[in-house]
């Protein structure tokens, strides 16, 4: 599975995790109250609640960063082994007297040869930040401008590019104002940010003190030096993207109020099928206001307008406003005004340009957006793929070779998934794709002509796997795909572009109607059942927070039914079974657990003839259930149930023994 698909699935899952822990109604209420302009002075009660803390654990436990240690060397694996009570007490104690640990800073290489700083807070601080984020996000989402697309739920770079294209294609705004904020994340003014949070209605003083401490957490550089920041938000912190949007939200609305949301005596509003609100600008056109629209993705933004004169005035005003109002430094070299009819403008790894496309109804020249993968992005992609080809060449055995090929394919699919919305992507990648294929031909072992059974580099082969990301390429009848070790290697230029889709404003994770457009609500499992499971965790013996969290997930995934019999589970008669015994692996992962009836659990571990017969008679299992049961028995070290001795129409699945009798 490629990286973009994994991210999308993770986001979809996060949207429903709040339902698992009964927090969705709380977040919905915060969103409604924020929309109504209410003030929030007692948020810490929600932030430190049991369900919010456990939801925070679930949201971060599978993030790749959770396995990256900070200064204290603790990773998620340490916390997984704690009991639920231990985790809750630890978090509550840290909130009561919060002092952030040092943030470990690493320098990450950039494509231009420079580096950017990445802060790695301790895992305890990440959990604290996640608890806060979950509560602040619905409040802030209600106040954020609709033209902001970065680091927000159910918004993406595709929506930003679609909006930029719309400004060119439909609004006919051909001048773009680019103002580059120099080192934005390192320059955010703490005092200004605290005031902005207060203005948004976040007025819980205990929470604001904690947020100030998070911003001022000491940073440990790679050489061991400790730095105490006076400005900026740590890149890598869970709260940083939200705080960045809070800081620039004031700027979004300032631009918006110049034209798009400017108040006039008469309002001519309308709403289209997608839920987007628009208005007839006839009243605005009678004023001296200058038409302008912002499209922002975190700190990267474009301001579209109609004339160079307007663009020059906006350019100066924006620089002055950002420097004086937000105390943010501007990079003069990277800031400019662009006429899209004559020059390209880079945005989020794409280049935008307006090209002639026929005539309008009144005979005027019509312009349409032409988008490409930016030269910088192409160069970076080519370098990374070329490096991966070398890794494939140097693999010591076929098993590792296939893994490296899979990684190469994942990189190709990731590039395609992100850049497929460019109108001319195929042309952009054609030359680079053939250069990479030539490199493969020179580096990989060759095959004999027309040899379909070779392990060498060849155009002949057949993919028999089930990876949907690969299947969609192999189904196409084209000349692009090559094979090595009988594994397909995708071609960079084998891509089909699609039109970027605008964000539907009706999609909203904090309204019931909006969530229906994201995913189906949990219908097979009631909130009463989930509440019982949350209120009755397994606390005795070796039960961990990971065990209880996965127990809840499995109940939803199995629709509240036994994984062997398929019958509805009785919550008082349910067992959460380790497929491979805990004493062997100490593994409480989701993959190693399953929910079953207590009698099925006894039957999995039973070795005595009388016990097995009695349980089989009581359960009356069918053939499919026996197959599932046998798989679980084999995993715990027991034999499959003997077909002849029990006079049952069953067979032993997957693993057979020389002597199967239990008696």
Question: Which residues are covered by each model-predicted region?
Answer:
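Active-site-adjacent bridging/hinge elements
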Residues: 99-111, 212-229, 387, 406-411, ...
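Non-catalytic, polymerase-adjacent accessory regions of viral genome-replication enzymes
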Residues: 1-85
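Active-site and adjacent loop segments of nucleotide-processing enzymes
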Residues: 1-29, 308, 325, 348-553, ...
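Short cysteine-rich loop/turn motifs with clustered Cys
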Residues: 544-575, 597-599
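Conserved polymerase palm-domain catalytic core
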Residues: 87, 95, 102, 143-147, ...
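Polybasic, low-complexity binding patches
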Residues: 583-591, 603-643
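Histidine-centered nuclease catalytic patch
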Residues: 566-598, 604-609
């Amino acid at each position: 599975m490629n990286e973009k698909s994994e991210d999308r699935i993770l986001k979809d899952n996060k949207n429903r995790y709040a339902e698992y822990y009964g927090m969705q109604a709380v977040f919905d209420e915060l969103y409604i109250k924020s929309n109504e302009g209410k003030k929030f002075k007692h948020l810490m009660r929600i932030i430190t609640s049991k369900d919010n803390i456990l939801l925070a654990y679930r949201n971060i436990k599978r993030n790749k960063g959770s396995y990256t240690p900070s200064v204290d060397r603790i990773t998620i694996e340490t916390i997984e082994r704690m009991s639920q009570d231990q985790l809750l007490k630890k978090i509550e104690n840290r909130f009561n007297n919060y002092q952030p640990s040092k943030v470990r800073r690493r320098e990450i290489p950039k494509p231009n040869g420079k580096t950017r700083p990445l802060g790695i807070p301790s895992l305890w601080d990440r959990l604290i930040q996640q608890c806060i984020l979950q509560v602040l996000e619905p409040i802030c989402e209600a106040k954020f401008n609709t033209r902001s697309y970065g680091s927000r739920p159910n918004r993406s770079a595709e929506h930003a590019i679609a909006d930029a294209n719309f400004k060119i294609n439909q609004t006919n705004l051909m001048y773009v104002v680019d103002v580059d904020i120099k080192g934005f994340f390192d320059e955010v003014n703490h005092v200004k940010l605290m005031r902005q949070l207060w203005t948004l209605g976040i007025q819980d003083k205990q929470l604001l003190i904690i947020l100030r401490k998070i911003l001022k957490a000491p940073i440990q550089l790679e050489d061991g030096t400790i730095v105490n920041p006076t400005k900026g938000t740590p890149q890598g912190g869970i709260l940083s993207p939200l705080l960045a949007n809070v800081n620039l939200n004031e700027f979004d609305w300032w631009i918006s109020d110049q034209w798009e949301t400017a108040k006039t005596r008469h309002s001519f509003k309308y709403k289209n099928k997608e839920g987007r609100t628009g208005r007839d600008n006839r009243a605005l056109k009678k004023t001296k206001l200058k038409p302008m629209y912002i499209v922002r993705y975190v700190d990267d933004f474009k301001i579209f307008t109609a004339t160079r004169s307007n663009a020059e005035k906006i350019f100066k005003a924006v620089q002055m406003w950002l420097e004086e109002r937000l105390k943010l430094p501007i990079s003069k070299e990277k800031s400019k005004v662009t006429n899209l009819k004559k020059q390209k403008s880079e945005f989020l790894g794409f280049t935008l340009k307006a090209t002639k496309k026929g005539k309008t109804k009144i005979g005027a020249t019509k312009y349409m957006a032409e988008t490409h993968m930016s030269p910088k992005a192409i160069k970076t992609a080519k370098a990374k793929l070329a490096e991966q080809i070398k890794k494939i060449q140097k693999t010591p055995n076929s098993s590792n070779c296939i893994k490296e090929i899979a990684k190469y394919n994942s990189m190709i699919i990731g590039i395609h998934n992100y850049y497929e919305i460019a109108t001319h992507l195929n042309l952009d990648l054609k030359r680079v794709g053939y250069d990479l294929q030539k490199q493969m031909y020179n580096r990989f072992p060759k095959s004999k002509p027309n040899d379909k059974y070779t392990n060498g580099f060849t155009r002949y082969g057949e993919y028999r796997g089930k990876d949907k990301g690969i299947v969609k390429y192999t189904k196409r009848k084209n000349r692009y795909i090559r094979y090595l070790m009988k594994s397909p290697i995708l071609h960079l230029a084998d891509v089909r572009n699609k039109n970027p889709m605008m964000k539907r404003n009706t999609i909203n994770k904090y309204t019931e109607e909006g969530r229906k457009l994201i995913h189906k609500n949990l219908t097979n499992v009631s909130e009463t059942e989930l509440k019982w499971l949350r209120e009755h965790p397994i606390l005795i013996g070796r039960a961990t927070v990971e065990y209880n969290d996965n127990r809840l997930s499995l109940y939803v995934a199995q629709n509240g039914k036994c994984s062997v019999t398929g019958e509805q589970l009785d919550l008082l008669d349910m067992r959460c079974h380790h497929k491979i015994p805990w004493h062997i692996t100490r593994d409480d992962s989701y993959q190693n657990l399953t929910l079953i009836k207590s009698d099925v659990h006894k039957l999995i571990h039973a070795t005595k003839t009388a016990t097995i017969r009695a349980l089989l008679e009581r359960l009356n299992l069918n053939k499919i259930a026996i197959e599932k049961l046998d798989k679980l028995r084999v995993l715990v070290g027991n034999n499959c149930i003997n077909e002849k001795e029990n006079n049952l129409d069953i067979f032993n699945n997957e693993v057979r023994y020389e002597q199967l009798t239990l008696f």
